[in-house]
Amino acid sequence: FYTQGDYGIWQCSRPCHHETYDNRKIVEKMVEAQGYTVAADGTLLAPQRAALKMTVPSELVPHCPKCGAPMTMNLRADSTFVEDDGWHKAASRYDDFIRRHQGMKVLFLELGVGYNTPGIIKYPFWQMTAGNPKAVYACINYRDAACPTELQNQAICIEGDFERL
């Protein structure tokens, strides 16, 4: 559930409508235009002998198909965040899961969540853990793995790089 957005989709920067668009193919073209090769498994291969171009050709810059404004990442940064149909369906599934598992053993796993918008993930996880003695809050974060002292008996906080843990 991409409650905070998804780097893999674009939305109109205005936004003039509430649809999002998969950006994988165009991002691959942007990466290739800089000199990389994208392997069949998605691995990026840097050029062996040439320097990276570090620019994207203007014809690859995405524009809204409805109004022509530049497209932007679908990230909850301000009031322009688009909650599309897929977002609402995922939110409904999440709410249903939370409702069906109240009072049961639940792991609230928080991976790399910061304090940009703590009211979306972090604080609700803390509240749901505090309200359920069978719940566990687990936080893995590069530099800021913490929880309120009231949750310390129900929490696991690990600081470190995901790739090394």
Predicted regions and their residues:
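Conserved catalytic alpha/beta core of Sir2/sirtuin-type deacylases, generalized to analogous enzyme cores
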Residues: 1-165
